[in-house]
Structures are given as C-alpha cells and as structure tokens.
Amino acid sequence: MMWRRWLALALVAVAWVHAEEQVRSKSKICANVFCGAGRECAVTEKGEPTCLCIEQCKPHKRPVCGSNGKTYLNHCELHRDACLTGSKIQVDYDGHCKEKKSVSPSASPVVCYQSNRDELRRRIIQWLEAEIIPDGWFSKGSNYSEILDKYFKNFDNGDSRLDSSEFLKFVEQNETAINITTYADQENNKLLRGLCVDALIELSDENADWKLSFQEFLKCLNPSFNPPEKKCALEDETYADGAETEVDCNRCVCACGNWVCTAMTCDGKNQKGAQTQAEEEMTRYVQELQKHQETAEKSKRVSTKEI
C-alpha cells in the first residue's frame, strides 16, 4: 500500500517538473515577442512563437464599457472579445454601460452573449471544484462527478431531466455564480441570467428537448469542455457574436449563434392592432433568420461528413 503512495508521489513530481520545464521553455521562446492587447504568445509544435487570442483572462472584477455598448468584466475580456470576433472594440469608459433613459429605434434586445454564457459557466465550475474533497486515510471524499450528481438529484423533479427553471434554481444556490451584472437595470440582469441558463442548456442538449439528462449536465459543466464559438448566418454571410442588423426601427443581435430581435411598433402608434401586427412581422422575420441559420449549419455538417 505504501509503495503505491510513493509511486503516485513520484509521478506527480515528474509531471510537475515537466510542467515547470514547459513554462520555462515558453518563457524563453516568448521573451521578446509582443502580441498586443487580447492576444498572448504561444509555442507551436515546431517550437516557434505565435500570437493567439487569450485563452482565459484572470477573473478580477473591474467592469468597463466597450465602444460596442457591451459591459465587460475587465479590460482583458474586452480585448479578448475583440480578438475572437475580429472586430475593433475600444474602452468607452470604466464601469458598467449606462442604461439609456428613453426607448429609441436603436434600442437593443436583452441577450446573453457567448462571453456572458462562458463567464457564468466558469463561475459555476469554480464553485463546484471548490467542493471537491480528496479521499482521506479513513474516509471517502467527493469527486467532481459525485458533486454534480448530488446537485442534479436535489433539483430534478423526478423525471431524470433538468429543465431551465430547475437549472436556474441550481445556479441560484451560489451568489457569486449568478452575480452577472451586464445591465444597469436589475430586471434586465435577472432576465440575462435566465437567458444564459438557456444558452448553457443548448450547449449539450443533444436531443434538443431543452432538458438535460445527467450525462448532458455532466458534459455541459465538464471543465475540459471548450464551448464552440457559434456564428449567425444571414443571406450567405456569417456574423460573429455581438453583430447587429436593423430592420425598420427594430434591431437584431447575434447572440450564442441565434438572432434575437426587438419587436417595436415603427410608426410610433400604441394601438393594439398596430402593436400586434409589428410583433407578428418581427416574429416572421426572426423565423426567417433562424431558417438561414439552420440551413447554414446543415450545409456545414454535410461538408464535414463529405470531408
């Protein structure tokens, strides 16, 4: 029994030394390489330096408002988003983006961007990992999978599936995890949490029933799983997360691979008939956008299979 522990310690020591050597090697190769904001130096398989978008920013909280009207957790997240989307985003001012007083034709819908979704997911994983208890000499601990199983059973209503309301109740167990404050208005932030929970469910909902089995739940919150960067499709063009387009006085935003639009009455009238007609027109338009998106994704899957 003792020799197994010594062997395990030896393997850990070897892995640690190897990791230290890799860090020193990377530091040496990247010593004189400047990558610019939102990018970091990495070493290729050939041992050459290259600049890539930052994989993960440090989670320190210093909100800034970007020139695109989005609030970011810190400067690093803003520049990382600019790098990933290939767009030019500058810091407009420190702090959360200010809420517009009046509703104007350019008002945007409340949406959960991929950066919001990934930040919520990161916080949940960090919270769950903090509950891991290693096995002791005379006691059994709790691993990551067992902790997830405990929460899954606690919030499942008995159908062996977590829907969005059950998932949201699970997330609300941790105050840090739900404290996403992109908007100045608290009601919008509450709506944002629900939208981001839906976005998390969509990540691993393999049968598209908007409910997660335990295996889907496990995949969604697997620390080694990297959520894909999804884009929106429209008229044979693809748009990055955060891209916007206008239809009359309404604005549509690309968020987590889906188009989300406002439903405003463009002639300024508040009559019920006009409002209903405007909403119906926007519903049809959003459906058209989603059809374009589904067609593009199907074409992509077919192309992948052919390759």
Curated annotation (Swiss-Prot):
Q: What Gene Ontology biological process does one annotation of this record name?
A: hematopoietic stem cell homeostasis
Carbohydrate-modified residues are N143, N174, N179
Which locations, inside or outside the cell, does it occupy? Answer: Secreted
**Keyword annotations from UniProtKB, A to Z:** Disulfide bond, Glycoprotein, Heparin-binding, Phosphoprotein, Repeat, Secreted, Signal
Q: Where is the EF-hand domain?
A: 143-177, 192-227
Tell me, in a sentence or two, what this protein's role is: Secreted glycoprotein that is involved in various physiological processes, such as angiogenesis, regulation of the immune response, cell proliferation and differentiation. Plays a role in the development of the central nervous system, skeletal system, lungs, and ureter. Promotes endothelial cell survival, migration and differentiation into network structures in an AKT-dependent manner. Also promotes survival of cardiac myocytes. Initiates various signaling cascades by activating different receptors on the cell surface such as DIP2A, TLR4 or BMP receptors.
Q: What is its main location?
A: secreted
Task: Look up the coiled coil feature and give its residue ranges.
Answer: none
Q: Which residues carry this modification: Phosphoserine?
A: S164
VWFC domain location: 232-286
Does the entry annotate any disulfide bonds, and if so which pairs?
C30-C41, C35-C51, C53-C83, C57-C76, C65-C97
**In the record, which residues are listed under signal peptide?**
1-19
In this chain the Kazal-like domain maps to 47-99
* Full protein name: Follistatin-related protein 1
Q: The Follistatin-like domain covers which part of the protein?
A: 29-52
GO cellular component terms listed in the entry, alphabetical order: extracellular region
**GO molecular-function annotation terms?**
calcium ion binding; heparin binding
InterPro entries with a match to the protein in the record: EF-hand-dom_pair, EF-hand_FSTL1, EF_hand_dom, Fol_N, Follistatin/Osteonectin_EGF, Kazal_dom, Kazal_dom_sf, Prot_Inhib_GrowthFact_Antg
